[in-house]
Regions:
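Membrane-interface interhelical connector segments
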Residues: 7-8, 44-60
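Extended, low-polarity transmembrane helix blocks
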Residues: 1-44, 63-70, 74, 81-147
């Protein structure tokens, strides 16, 4: 696969415009904002998050809080902008699967066994669909195709 074909495969949306495109835009922006706020929150309440990660049995809790917080904050921003939607959605889906397997198992509750699984499904949807017409991915793809 050529680099150009790889870029097209990564950025090309599966649904553009119409009601489906608008629905995917809402899902992408809303989940992106949610991830941005939870990622920033991990740094605002840093020591508490480290303590929770340690309780959940996550190795290297300090490092993992930083990595998870950065992934959620930066990944959320990327989703809002529609930048690298597929790889970011896959990374966030893995993050949610880990949250379900660790905090969900230890704590349960409406977030870890309600919101996290819903976000996992939404990230899988975005990994499948891509950024749609209203995304930076689409603009980058248009430039790539024009070149």
């Amino acid at each position: 696969m050529t680099p150009s074909a790889l870029v097209r495969a990564t950025l090309a949306p599966r649904a553009d415009g119409g009601a489906v495109g608008i629905a995917l835009l809402v899902v992408r922006v809303a989940s992106g904002l949610f991830f941005m706020f939870t990622g920033i929150g991990k740094f605002v309440t840093f020591q508490g998050e480290v303590d929770h990660f340690a309780e959940f049995g996550i190795p290297w809790p300090t490092v993992m809080v930083v990595l998870s917080g950065l992934l959620e904050a930066v990944g959320g921003l990327c989703l809002v902008l529609g930048l690298l939607v597929r790889p970011v959605a896959i990374a966030l889906a893995v993050n949610m699967a880990i949250a379900i397997a660790t905090a969900g198992r230890e704590v349960g509750g409406p977030f870890h066994l309600g919101v996290a699984p819903a976000l996992l499904v939404l990230m899988l949807l975005l990994a499948w669909s891509g950024g749609t017409a209203w995304s930076l991915d689409r603009r980058l793809l248009s430039r790539e195709e024009a070149a």
